[in-house]
Amino acid sequence: FALAHMVNDFDIMKSYLDEGANGIETDITFSPEGEPESAFHGVPCDCKRWCDRTVSFDSYLQKTSDLSTPGHPDYRENLLIIILDLKLNGLSQDALANGGRRLADKLAAHFWTGGRRDQRATFVVSVPQTSQKVFMKTFREEMEAIGMGDMNAKVGFDFTDNGDVSVTKAVYDELGITEHIWASDGITNCVALLFRGTSRLEELIQKRDEGESTYISKVYAWTYDKETSVVLALELGVDGVMTNYADFVISILNKPEHSSKYRLATYEDDPFERFKAV
């Protein structure tokens, strides 16, 4: 997966999809009560990026619904995965719980109500810290409560705190989440990968490849903009690279030394199916 980073308005969304990105990551802000409000990152953000792009969350969901619906004039077949980077830090536990319910309500309203089941997008609900696990809990409960339990097939989960892998697994076990888990490791593009290292990324890949006992479906690295970093990630066996330059990552993927091993994912590929690094 070539995952376009910080896709917070429609102009940049079109640009990245034109480049060939098959996934987008969007920053979602919340009110103090836990209501999803807008796609917005703000400063600071990645180097060489405009931090203040924004649209309302409802507008964002309507647009991505149109883009992922076959037969719609705006349909883009390469939009496969939408990572919702949820800006939850500072919210109370009550607000987090409300936020999980409200996100489920809004996804259902824009994508799946009224018998609509043909949208092709898959979501990753990306929570900053394991201490905010109640958000995932209430999201899943609300999906069942509103009769959308079958649509959990289109939803995955991710914690982005670069935390201890065993602690993260314990939290997923507590929540009863045993599949559809995307695991990530990374750092802003303003800091060289040299300073971050890849030891945790390698640990995630190893855990993914352990067999039926593993809890990880996919592993992605962020935010990789340099060729050396992208090549290293591919050599390690990641499932996705989040980047500010989707066309650049795709061009590396298409080089002969990589295309024999990798290809860009399509709709026929299950975003939650586990593939081992070879």
From Swiss-Prot:
Cofactor detail note: Binds 1 Mg(2+) ion per subunit.
E.C. no: 4.6.1.-
GO terms of biological process kind: killing of cells of another organism; lipid catabolic process
Binding site for Mg(2+): 25, 27, 85
Role played: Dermonecrotic toxins cleave the phosphodiester linkage between the phosphate and headgroup of certain phospholipids (sphingolipid and lysolipid substrates), forming an alcohol (often choline) and a cyclic phosphate. This toxin acts on sphingomyelin (SM). It may also act on ceramide phosphoethanolamine (CPE), lysophosphatidylcholine (LPC) and lysophosphatidylethanolamine (LPE), but not on lysophosphatidylserine (LPS), and lysophosphatidylglycerol (LPG). It acts by transphosphatidylation, releasing exclusively cyclic phosphate products as second products.
Similarity section: Belongs to the arthropod phospholipase D family. Class II subfamily.
MF (Gene Ontology): lyase activity; metal ion binding; phosphoric diester hydrolase activity; toxin activity
Organism superkingdom: Eukaryota
CDD domains: GDPD_like_SMaseD_PLD
Entry keyword set: Cytolysis, Dermonecrotic toxin, Disulfide bond, Hemolysis, Lipid degradation, Lipid metabolism, Lyase, Magnesium, Metal-binding, Secreted, Toxin
Compartments, record wording: Secreted
Protein's UniProt name: Dermonecrotic toxin LspiSicTox-betaIE2ii
Positions of the catalytic residues: 5, 41
SS bond partners: 45-51, 47-190
Cofactor: Mg(2+)
Tissue: Expressed by the venom gland.
Catalytic activity: an N-(acyl)-sphingosylphosphocholine = an N-(acyl)-sphingosyl-1,3-cyclic phosphate + choline; an N-(acyl)-sphingosylphosphoethanolamine = an N-(acyl)-sphingosyl-1,3-cyclic phosphate + ethanolamine; a 1-acyl-sn-glycero-3-phosphocholine = a 1-acyl-sn-glycero-2,3-cyclic phosphate + choline; a 1-acyl-sn-glycero-3-phosphoethanolamine = a 1-acyl-sn-glycero-2,3-cyclic phosphate + ethanolamine
A GO CC term assigned to this protein in UniProt: extracellular region
KW Ribonucleoprotein (keyword) present: no
Record-linked InterPro entries: PLC-like_Pdiesterase_TIM-brl (IPR017946)
Entry-linked SUPFAM superfamilies: PLC-like phosphodiesterases
Top enzyme category: lyase
